[in-house]
Amino acid sequence: MTTQNRHLSGKVAWVTGSSRGIGRVVADHLAGCGATVAVHGTTPTSARAFNEAESLAAVAEAIAAAHGTETLAVHGDLSREAEVKRAAAEIRARFGRIDILVNCAGGDIGAAGTGAADAGRPQRNDALNISPEDMQAVFDRNLMSCVWCCREVAPEMMARRAGHIVNFGSNAGLVGDEVGAMYATAKAAVTHYSRCLAAQLRRYNVAVNVVAPGTIVTARIIASNQVQPDRLNESGRLDRYGWPIEIARLVEFLVSDANTYITGQVLRIDGGEQLWPA
């Protein structure tokens, strides 16, 4: 059983893209803080990619068992509005509402999906040569999933005059880069959409912020051959890769009652990899 501070007790959190990777750790951490958590994957077996779990249901059950809180597994392609509405309806039918939305779903993953080479990264992955199919897949996975989920959840938060939305950007979305150009562009769009949404929702007391991670060690990142072994240092040094729990702690603050005056902001968490303004 968890020994964390249960300051999120009574809150219902939907963490998209939480069948594995950063999203799974965020969901687990929020549950440890007392939140009721809906975990999400594209399919019931999304968690099997990179051997992180047997099923989405198994992830939800493990989180519930670890922290003694209620969980629910929902699946769906969040780039499709109808599937977003269905997943949200399942959460509301079980828990009555959604207080917290964390949009972790995304990734530099093309049309072939995570089962392709390099963990699904598009093969011609630059601004001039990426295929139309891969480009659409990257934008759907990162931008449109975020837009549809925010549009679905924001109205009930506005009506209650309370709520927190955290969208996942990326350091890649704050700089130009030849490789992964469409992913960087999609994450830049997520960032600016979030600023626009924050401006619209602040009068309703709904906070919208962006977490922009640097390179965070997950099974997919390792499988995509992007990791330099000498930076896999878990000590207190900053010139290393980050770990999902470090992201989860930042999300915890942003969705808690301690956050009373932060909205529309991009919070880098990258160990100082980028030191210029967002």
Ranges and model annotations:
Residues 150, 186, 194:
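Active-site helix of classical SDR
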Residues 120-147, 162, 166, 190, ...:
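Catalytic Tyr-X3-Lys loop
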Residues 51-52, 114-123, 182, 203, ...:
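A glycine/serine/threonine-rich, flexible loop-to-helix segment
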Residues 155, 199-200, 260:
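Alpha-helical segment proximal to the catalytic Tyr-Lys
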Residues 2-4, 175, 252, 263-278:
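Short C-terminal tail/terminal secondary-structure segment
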Residues 1-95, 107-129, 133-134:
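Short-chain dehydrogenase/reductase
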Residues 170:
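Residue(s) in the substrate-gating loop at a strand-loop-helix junction
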Residues 144-147, 203, 210, 230-262, ...:
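C-terminal helical subdomain
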